[in-house]
């Protein structure tokens, strides 16, 4: 897992969802662990796209359920595998 991407995503999640940084791990599920709702997840994906200057298609975004999945997709899109 790309630590730099994880750290950036973690900061975005902490800011957007107002959660404790210690509660965010690669295994964290956005909805069940971080109490995000569907609007929160859309806003997070938009923030990820802006931060990393990438486009995440809706069909891919809908499949992102954990922080680790988001890191992997962003790493793939940015070529930072």
From Swiss-Prot:
It comes from Picosynechococcus sp. (strain ATCC 27264 / PCC 7002 / PR-6) (Agmenellum quadruplicatum). Transmembrane segments: none annotated. It is found in: Cytoplasm. Its main location: cytoplasm. The gene is acpP. The keyword Cytoplasm applies. Belongs to the acyl carrier protein (ACP) family. This is Acyl carrier protein. PROSITE patterns: CARRIER. GO terms for biological process: lipid A biosynthetic process.
